[in-house]
Regions:
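Beta-strand-rich domains and repeat architectures in extracellular enzymes and scaffolds
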Residues: 13-62
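Loop/turn-rich, solvent-exposed surfaces of beta-rich toroidal or solenoidal domains
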Residues: 195-196, 216-250
Length: 305
């Protein structure tokens, strides 16, 4: 096993002051960040086919597009609370919205339509994050206010062409980021309040709930938030309230610790289409950080082979 490399990320861009929210704290802020005023809370970065980076502002219902030069455009605003984005083949985005459930955002028409708001006549408790599998299935999390004292968060899968999602897990202490291995066999799940990343089979033979293993145990901070897997199977983990993101190989060995030199609220990660550069969302300063991990990943691949 190679030694874990410590890397300092660089600021790519920061939300401009002209886009700061300046009103009174809304309910989301009062509950999740008591006593604070937030100008934004960035989550869910996702690259489009042209290399633009999209991200969401959870409490204020905003979706931003960031171009190559780091310029921000407000692409959409609503009364929702978008937490995560997954790009769809037609250029639209599936959105995990804490308030409105699973929706579809069309960036060309600037429209949002509902995909589903709940399951079995029960509304979702509050969606957290989402990813799209190669076969078209949508995997998304429903943490609500779950934690170690109430491990009732859920993981869902909406199969391609289906209208109702399946409950895959219902016992997670705040399920958050979710990602799949390149071959679609494994699902990685951030159990934020357990400070751990779990792993399960996407198509397990179990008749009800699949067997789940603790894949990586973190320490410190709040816990893992967003997850992202590149084409070579390297798993990036945003370590919430720790000011860093981790990169693990497919065996779960740490390859790199990428530190953000600004705030500590590292919320989300996204691999650039080149598979070497990692974008990290940091909500305290409203910044997107970038780290080029090409040489580190190449060394790790060479060691594995």
């Amino acid at each position: 096993m190679l030694a874990c490399v410590d890397i300092r990320a660089e600021v790519f861009t920061t939300l401009p002051a002209s886009l700061h929210y300046r009103g009174e704290p809304n309910e989301w802020v009062r509950v999740t960040r008591p006593g604070q005023k937030l100008h934004s809370f960035l989550e869910g970065p996702a690259f489009d086919a042209d290399g633009n980076l999209w991200c969401v502002d959870v409490p204020y219902g905003r979706i931003f597009r960031i171009d190559f030069s780091g310029q921000w455009t407000l692409a959409h605003q609503s009364d929702g609370q978008p937490h995560g984005l997954a790009r769809l083949p037609d250029g639209m985005f599936a959105v995990a919205d804490y308030r409105h459930g699973l929706t579809r955002f069309d960036p060309v028409r600037d429209t949002v339509v509902s995909i589903c708001e709940g399951v079995n006549s029960e509304r979702f408790r509050g969606l957290g994050d989402i990813t799209r599998a190669q076969n078209g299935d949508l995997w998304f999390t429903d943490p609500g206010r779950s934690s170690l004292s109430d491990p009732s968060g859920r993981l869902f899968r909406l199969r391609e062409g289906a209208s109702t999602p399946d409950v895959m897990l219902a016992n997670v202490p705040y399920p958050n980021g979710v990602a799949l291995s390149p071959d679609g066999r494994f699902v990685y799940l951030a159990a934020t309040r357990a400070n751990a990343v779990w792993r399960l089979l996407a198509d397990a033979p179990d008749p009800v709930y699949p067997m789940v293993g603790l894949w990586v145990q973190l320490s410190g901070g709040l816990g893992p938030d967003g997850l992202a897997v590149n084409a070579d199977g390297f798993v990036a983990v945003a370590h919430g309230q720790a000011g860093r993101a981790w990169v693990f190989d497919a065996l779960g060995d740490p390859v790199a610790c990428v530190r953000t030199p600004g705030g500590l609220w590292t919320t989300a990660v996204a691999w650039h289409p080149d598979g070497a550069r990692l974008a990290i969302g940091e909500a305290q300063t409203g910044s997107i950080y970038v780290a080029d991990l090409g040489s580190v990943l190449a060394a790790a691949k060479g060691k594995a082979s």
